Curated annotation (Swiss-Prot):
It comes from the Bacteria. Residues 1-35 form the signal peptide. GO terms for molecular function: aliphatic amine dehydrogenase activity; methylamine dehydrogenase (amicyanin) activity. This is Methylamine dehydrogenase heavy chain. It comes from Methylorubrum extorquens (strain ATCC 14718 / DSM 1338 / JCM 2805 / NCIMB 9133 / AM1) (Methylobacterium extorquens). Methylamine dehydrogenase carries out the oxidation of methylamine. Electrons are passed from methylamine dehydrogenase to amicyanin. The keyword Signal applies. Tetramer of two light and two heavy chains. It catalyses: 2 oxidized [amicyanin] + methylamine + H2O = 2 reduced [amicyanin] + formaldehyde + NH4(+) + 2 H(+).
């Protein structure tokens, strides 16, 4: 059984290709010519000319280009609706190249080699009631067609506002890990290569999942330590706690930035203290913490804020942190500024005025990256040049409440 409906958006809204209905042709012919034609209008006129010439008028579903570092995935949970939606965006052209439906509070994943994107999700027999089914679905990134549909036994998913690192892929993209909260904390293991559920690994009261290798991941525990978990080929897992790296009153945000490829975990607190951990050696190496804001700025109310508040770019070793002046309890409110920080020295490189209320930030992992600033209120993705701080393009009409932005860790 397939749990998602897939589709590719066509020409009028986003300028992809095929149109071809007689009514549309008549409408275009009757309309007044614009001084500067949009791509969609030009495509529609070409389709009308083809129709008049007697060419075939059958609809054609196009394939998207293969994923590159600038393919952006935006997830809209639709304010806790039973059916949610994904938007796939070409960052170079600022166009939606496809959409896919999800279930209730899906957790999106994107393969680091661009071979698929997918979700761990939940649906109900009668849309929002009835028998619950949890599943993992993988989709072809060019057609959006399902390539794997794996049902999870006993409805194990933790249904909470979409936290990207509650579900994760191992570096080889062959295993998906997801978090279970009840009846006891555990991490589910899904064999993507074999297209089957594997097992649950019981863990102590720890959260988030950061794979450091194909058989090892780390979690954050309530006492301020990390838990190292070895999956174990024999079905037996091994666990070991690290040192405690933050104090009880140093509250970490819910959405850290993590690069499985480099093993760098970047985790700010509510006040802008940034902890960095190197997980690349299979052990946790705690780097010196840095401060995003000066003491004077903190007194003025400057602090991180948003849903996904931080992003990390591997090659430049830079941190991008959303921030604004806010009350202490407003750490989930959007921000109007982005702070660019050298991850090695802690030095502030730039302060970008975004001129929009931004909830989530992402960055492409190419040599000259793009910054992606997602506004839930505007239902729009704004694309920036991180060097100049200038907005270069935008994509609007992204659902009801888009909240999560993801790129491939290529």
């Amino acid at each position: 059984m397939t749990h998602a409906y897939t589709k590719v958006r066509q020409a009028l809204c986003y300028g992809s290709a095929t149109l071809g209905a007689a009514a549309l042709a008549a409408l275009i012919a009757a309309g007044s010519a614009a001084a500067a034609e949009s791509h969609g209008v030009a495509t529609a006129k070409a389709a009308a000319a083809d129709l008049a010439a007697g060419k075939a008028d059958d609809p054609v579903v196009l394939k998207a280009a293969p994923i590159n570092a600038r393919r952006v995935f935006v997830y809209d949970p639709k304010h806790f609706a039973a059916i949610s939606q994904f938007y796939m965006i070409d960052g170079d052209t600022a166009r939606v190249v496809g959409t896919a439906d999800g279930g209730f509070l899906s957790n999106p994943v994107v393969a680091s080699d661009g071979s698929f994107f997918g979700q761990a999700s939940t649906v109900y027999e009668r849309i929002a009631r009835g028998k619950r089914t949890d599943y993992v679905e993988l989709l072809d990134p060019q057609t959006n067609n399902p390539i794997a549909d794996i049902e999870l036994p006993n409805s194990p998913r933790f249904l909470v506002g979409t936290y990207p690192w509650m579900t994760a892929l191992t570096p080889n993209n062959k295993t998906l890990l997801f978090y279970q909260f009840s009846p006891q904390p555990a991490v589910g293991v899904v064999d993507l290569a074999g297209k089957k559920f594997d097992r649950m690994i019981e863990v102590p009261d720890c959260y988030h999942i950061f794979p450091s290798s194909n058989d090892t991941f780390f979690m954050h525990c309530r006492d301020g330590s990390l838990l190292k978990v070895g999956i174990g080929a024999d079905g037996k897992s091994q666990t070991k706690r690290t040192e405690i790296f933050h104090k009880e009153n140093e509250y970490l945000i819910n959405h850290p930035a993590y690069s499985p490829k480099s093993g760098r975990l970047v985790w700010p607190t509510y006040t802008g203290k940034i902890f960095q951990i190197d997980l690349s050696s299979q052990d946790a190496k705690f780097l010196p913490a840095i401060e995003a804001f000066t003491d004077a700025e903190k007194k003025e109310g400057w602090a991180p804020g948003g849903w996904q508040q931080v992003a990390y770019h591997r090659e430049s070793d830079r941190i991008f942190l959303l921030g604004d002046q806010r009350a202490a309890s407003k750490h989930k409110a959007p921000s109007r500024f982005l702070f660019v920080i050298d991850a090695k020295t802690g030095k502030r490189i730039n302060k970008i005025e975004l001129k929009h209320e931004i909830d989530s930030v992402g960055v492409s992992q190419d040599a000259k990256p793009q910054l992606y600033a997602l506004s839930t209120g505007d239902k729009a993705l704004y694309i920036f040049d991180p060097e100049t701080g200038k907005e270069v393009s935008s994509v609007n009409q992204l659902g009801a409440g888009p909240q999560v932005v993801m790129t491939s860790d290529m």
